[in-house]
């Protein structure tokens, strides 16, 4: 799911994707089959089943934030991938706070030179693994930060059958501090 969602390529979007098993973080490899017949889509709620990974993904948005819930199978290798996309991005994993912060700059023009979409993602489960990737999809194992043209963050954990991992996400075009404020004001 990309965030923000309104014409997201104009607004500097980033995405979250849950996967299991062998780590597939490259955007061309991590996609999953899903059926429109099995999805639930409303203005305030979206749910789908990611068949390739046996994960149920749900999201409910607010104006500047969203609450994600991923229901995992029993697996020793469960991951959530945050892709900050190209045109300049930064990610920083803060394990002791169960948090990823960063920014993305992807856009289709018509924005100021200093345009950034700052984001914060807060998880309700400790991270067993933490990785980032840098330009050209280079995996940086046990890394907590990356900055470049196209970077991302990967956090991982062992999950039990039906275990849910919740993620609170918010963004701001002003600052990381404002993204945190948006998260606290809109979804707590």
Pin down the residues of each PLM region.
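Accessory carbohydrate-recognition regions in carbohydrate-active enzymes
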Residues: 2-188
